[in-house]
A protein has these predicted regions:
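Short, glycine-/small- and polar/acidic-enriched structural segments
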Residues: 1-130, 134-148, 175
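Pocket-lining segment of extracytoplasmic ligand-binding domains
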Residues: 59-60, 90, 132-229
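Secondary-structure end/capping motifs
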Residues: 190-276
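Short linear loop/turn motifs
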Residues: 32-33, 40, 169-171, 234-244, ...
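N-terminal hydrophobic or amphipathic helices and topogenic motifs
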Residues: 1-28, 262-290
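Short Gly/Pro-enriched turn/cap motifs at secondary-structure boundaries
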Residues: 6, 172, 258-260
Length: 290
């Protein structure tokens, strides 16, 4: 059982493709893609054993490992940060202009790099939690919001709002890769062959999606409709384009689908320096090497 960390969308296109095209079946795997609910998130499902593989962001995974939940990364899709700060007001032109302002942040986490940035810049920001959409931002109830370039920012643009100044965390020295596939260390130790096959078939799914984006989008929309997710094809197409772009490193190199030791060290040092973890998590730890 595989659980992506959110509701069906193009963020997970490669896995839907691998399922629909029979890539998992070809390597002898019978995969069920089971999305989590708000009351039972992906990590809970992994810990209780109802899911065997989940997607997580690198920062989340490092925090969980530090908390005593041994996780192993078996595939890394994201190679750069999608995080951005999007101002609602025209008078926010620099980071310092965020001082004393209300800024939206996901209730479920994901915003740690932005919070670390704010602390380092000594910005007094009032973080306002939101669940999943940009309603608070659109209504003007907050002065700015955290967003991903592949989802919330696209929603904002689709509403006809064109922010003049946006802050990409990658441009500010916080380019931390995000989504990867994770399993518990125990499951990794006892199912290495199957997990290697799952990772390879998933990689094939993503490579096929990059080569056939229109057909991949059709597969995504079938998944969306089956789960009655409120979205549309235009938004999902833009999301897919953006997700595929984020699978390349900033230097433009082709997707490697693996974590780099440098990225793990950078993320771990960032969290350690901010006091969000107690111990430095190493590349060997997170990739299941002895």
């Amino acid at each position: 059982v595989f659980s992506p960390q959110w509701t069906p969308q193009s963020q997970f296109a490669g896995y839907y493709v691998a399922q629909a095209k029979g890539f998992y079946k070809e390597v002898g795997l019978d995969i069920v893609i089971d999305h989590p609910s708000a009351s039972n998130p992906a990590l809970n499902r992994l810990r209780e054993g109802s899911s065997h593989v989940i997607t997580l962001q690198l920062v989340q995974a490092i925090k969980y490992i530090d908390q005593g939940i041994p996780l192993v990364n078996i595939l890394q899709t994201s190679q750069q940060s999608s995080l951005m700060i999007v101002p609602r007001r025209k008078d926010i032109r620099t980071l310092q202009d965020l001082n004393g302002k209300k800024v939206g942040i996901w209730k479920a986490g994901f915003g740690e790099p932005a919070q670390i940035l704010a602390n380092r810049q000594k910005l007094d920001i009032r973080w306002i939690p939101f669940v999943s959409n940009v309603n608070l931002f659109i209504s003007g109830a907050i002065d700015a919001t955290l967003a991903t370039s592949y989802n919330e920012y696209l929603q904002i643009l689709a509403c006809g709002i064109q922010p003049e100044h946006v802050f990409y965390l990658a441009d500010l020295g916080y380019d931390i890769p995000e989504d990867g596939l994770y399993v518990t260390a125990d499951y990794y130790d006892t199912h290495r062959c199957e997990l290697q096959a799952f990772a390879e078939a998933s990689r094939r799914g993503w490579e096929w999606a990059a080569a056939h984006p229109e057909e991949a989008l059709t597969i995504v929309m079938e998944e969306v409709r089956r789960h009655h997710v409120g979205t549309n094809k235009v938004h999902q197409k833009r999301m897919l384009d953006n997700i595929l772009h984020l699978q390349h490193r900033r230097n433009g190199s082709s997707p490697a689908f693996e974590l780099s030791p440098e990225d793990v060290e950078k993320a771990s040092d960032l969290l350690l320096d901010a006091g969000l973890i107690r111990n430095k998590i190493t590349y060997r730890q997170i990739t299941g090497q002895p």
